[in-house]
C-alpha cells in the first residue's frame, strides 16, 4: 500500500526552506490545521445542530453574519489564542484587531489575518465554502503588544498564506513562498494527506468567474473583456465557459487546477471593489503567483498595494497569467 505524506510531516520536512526556520511557523500552520478540522466538523453537522441561517448581527462591513460565520471566527480565535505563535489576529468578522498579550504571546513573531468562512451566504444551500488565512512577521518590537502597523503590510511581506475548502472533500492549500501544495482530509484517520503537489495554473484556461448580474455596474474595460470571452473563435477556444459560485475559495481552487480567471472589479455600486485586500486579495494573490498565475487590481500588482485600513477593499482580477494580462489590456 502506497504511503502518503501527512501535512504535519510535510511542514516539518520543508521547514528548512523557510528563511526564518525556528519551528514557530510550522507550529502556527499546525494550529490553523487544527482549527480547520473543528470548523469542518461543525459545517458537516450544521443542519442538525441548528447553526444554519443568520445570526441576527452584522459584521464591520455591514454584511449580515451567518451563524457559522460567528462560530468559525470563534473557533479560529480561540485556537490561535491558546497557542503561543502569534501576538495578534485580525478577522474579517471583527471591527478591530485582537492583541494577544498573555505571557506565552510576548515573544511571538507572527500575526494572522483571516476570513473565517468565505462564501458563507452559500452555506444554507450546501455550496462549497472555505477559510482564507494570511501570515506575516510582526514589524513592532518583540515583547511589546501588536500594533496596527503589524497588520497594514503589503502582500509582498507575507510569509505564508492559504485556504481550507470545505466541499465534497476538505482540502488545505498553502504556500510559504516555495510553491503551492494541497492536502486532502481523511475523516477516517483524522489527518490531512498530500494530494496536490506543486500546483501550477495550466498554461491555457477557458473558464471565467464573474458575477454577471453586476454587469451593468462594471467599468467599460471589464464589459468589453466579458464580451470578448463570449465571442466565437475556434483558434482561441472561445467562447470561454462561465463558472461562478459566489465563493472565492471554490472559484479560485477550480481555476487554479483547471485553468481560468476570477474577476471582481470595481463598479458603480462598489467603487473600490468588494473583496477585502488583507483577508482575501493578498493571500489569494500570493498563492496565484506561487502557482505561476497573476493577481492585479486591473493595473497594479495586488501584493504591492499598501493597505491604509484593516477592512480596505480592492478590485481583484486573478488567475492564469495570460488570461489576466488579456483582461488588463481591456482595462487600459
Swiss-Prot record:
GO terms for cellular component: cytosol. Its cofactor is Mg(2+). GO terms for molecular function: fructose 1,6-bisphosphate 1-phosphatase activity; magnesium ion binding. It is an enzyme of class 3 (hydrolase). Pathway: Carbohydrate biosynthesis; gluconeogenesis. Belongs to the FBPase class 1 family. PANTHER family: FRUCTOSE-1,6-BISPHOSPHATASE-RELATED, SEDOHEPTULOSE-1,7-BISPHOSPHATASE, CHLOROPLASTIC. It comes from Christiangramia forsetii (strain DSM 17595 / CGMCC 1.15422 / KT0803). It comes from the Bacteria. One of its GO terms (biological process) is gluconeogenesis. Its EC number is 3.1.3.11. SUPFAM superfamilies: Carbohydrate phosphatase. Mg(2+) 1 binds at residues 92, 115, 117. InterPro entries: FBPase_C_dom, FBPase_class-1, FBPase_N, FBPtase, Fructose_bisphosphatase_AS. This is Fructose-1,6-bisphosphatase class 1 1. Its main location: cytoplasm.
Amino acid at each position: 500500500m502506497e504511503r502518503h505524506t501527512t501535512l504535519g510531516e510535510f511542514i516539518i520536512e520543508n521547514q528548512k526552506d523557510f528563511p526564518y526556520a525556528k519551528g514557530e511557523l510550522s507550529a502556527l500552520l499546525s494550529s490553523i490545521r487544527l482549527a480547520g478540522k473543528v470548523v469542518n466538523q461543525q459545517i458537516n453537522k450544521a443542519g442538525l445542530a441548528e447553526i444554519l441561517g443568520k445570526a441576527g448581527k452584522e459584521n464591520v462591513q455591514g454584511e449580515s453574519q451567518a451563524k457559522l460565520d460567528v462560530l468559525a471566527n470563534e473557533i479560529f480565535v480561540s485556537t490561535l489564542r491558546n497557542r503561543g505563535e502569534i501576538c495578534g489576529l485580525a478577522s474579517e468578522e471583527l471591527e478591530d484587531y485582537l492583541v494577544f498579550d498573555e505571557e506565552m504571546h510576548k515573544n511571538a513573531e507572527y500575526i494572522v489575518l483571516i476570513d473565517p468562512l468565505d462564501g458563507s451566504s452559500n452555506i444554507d444551500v450546501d455550496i462549497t465554502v472555505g477559510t482564507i488565512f494570511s501570515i506575516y512577521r510582526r514589524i513592532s518590537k518583540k515583547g511589546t503588544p501588536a500594533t496596527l502597523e503589524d497588520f497594514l503590510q503589503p502582500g509582498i511581506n507575507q510569509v505564508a498564506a492559504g485556504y481550507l475548502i470545505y466541499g465534497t472533500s476538505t482540502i488545505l492549500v498553502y504556500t510559504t513562498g516555495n510553491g503551492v501544495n494541497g492536502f486532502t482530509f481523511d475523516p477516517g484517520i483524522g489527518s490531512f494527506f498530500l494530494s496536490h503537489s506543486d500546483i501550477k495554473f495550466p498554461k491555457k484556461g477557458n473558464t471565467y468567474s464573474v458575477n454577471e448580474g453586476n454587469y451593468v455596474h462594471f467599468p467599460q474595460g471589464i464589459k468589453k473583456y466579458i464580451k470578448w470571452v463570449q465571442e466565437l473563435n475556434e483558434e482561441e477556444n472561445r467562447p470561454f465557459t462561465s463558472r461562478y459560485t459566489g465563493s472565492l475559495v471554490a472559484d479560485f481552487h477550480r481555476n487554479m487546477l483547471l485553468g481560468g480567471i476570477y474577476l471582481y472589479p470595481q463598479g458603480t455600486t462598489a467603487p473600490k471593489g468588494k473583496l477585502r485586500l488583507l483577508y482575501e486579495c493578498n493571500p489569494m494573490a500570493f498563492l496565484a503567483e506561487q502557482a505561476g498565475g497573476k493577481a492585479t487590481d486591473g493595473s497594479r500588482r495586488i501584493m504591492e498595494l499598501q493597505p491604509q485600513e484593516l477592512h480596505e477593499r480592492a478590485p481583484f482580477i486573478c488567475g492564469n497569467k495570460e488570461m489576466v494580462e488579456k483582461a488588463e489590456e481591456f482595462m487600459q
